[in-house]
Amino acid sequence: MCIRDSLNFLLTNRVPRIALTHFVGWWSRIRLPWVRDLSMAIWKLFSDLDLSEAREQRFASLHDCFIRELKPGLRPVDPRPEVISSPSDGIVGACGRISGSGEPQEVQVFQAKGFPYRLVDLLGNDARGHALALEFAGGSYVTLRLTSSMYHRFHVPCESRLEHVTYVSGDTWNVNPIALKSVERLFCKNERAVLHLRQHDGTRLL
């Protein structure tokens, strides 16, 4: 890891992560013009924030900007049943086949080259997670990473119904490429929610 990457990892991860996340969440909801303007100025300084696609151009708080809606007609979902659209904006970090069979502990995916993790650990490592790991062995996965400036709402990727949500408590590690190549099983350590979707033909998606 070069000096620049080491510094990036230090500044984004070797801090009181959970406390900082809670503070930023509190700060972002303050509805004072000077707080909003200062926060957005700093945000634009360190990112490529583009609000040209946003439905609204003025926001009461930083949080309102972060969860902004898009103008109507943007991000259309492909209606073909054999196509699954991306549920969000994002950069593809990894994709491929879910490897392993036979035992839930053997079913693996990759967060980065050379950094595998067990699917059961991602799903919560309970009885439901073990059953799902076996069900999805041999299936496909894709990892999407949202940068801070991207549109941050999520949408159902195809015609389906939400059957269950599993919440898994955890840390708040940054998921940038530097961290993914430095922290093993990072996704399994972070706070997360597993959404169980089922298509009309019975196919299950996570």
Residue map of PLM features:
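Conserved small/polar residues in nucleotide/adenosyl-binding loops
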Residues: 1-3
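Short helical patches
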Residues: 6-11, 38, 42
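Long amphipathic alpha-helical segments
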Residues: 8-9, 16-25
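Flexible, non-catalytic peripheral segments of proteins
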Residues: 26-32
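Extended, compositionally biased flexible segments
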Residues: 33-125, 134
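Conserved positions in beta-strands of structured domains
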Residues: 93, 163-166
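Cytosolic, membrane-proximal regulatory domains of ion/volume homeostasis and mechanosensation machinery
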Residues: 102-137, 141-151, 157, 165-206
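Phosphate/adenylate-binding glycine loop and adjacent helical scaffold
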Residues: 160
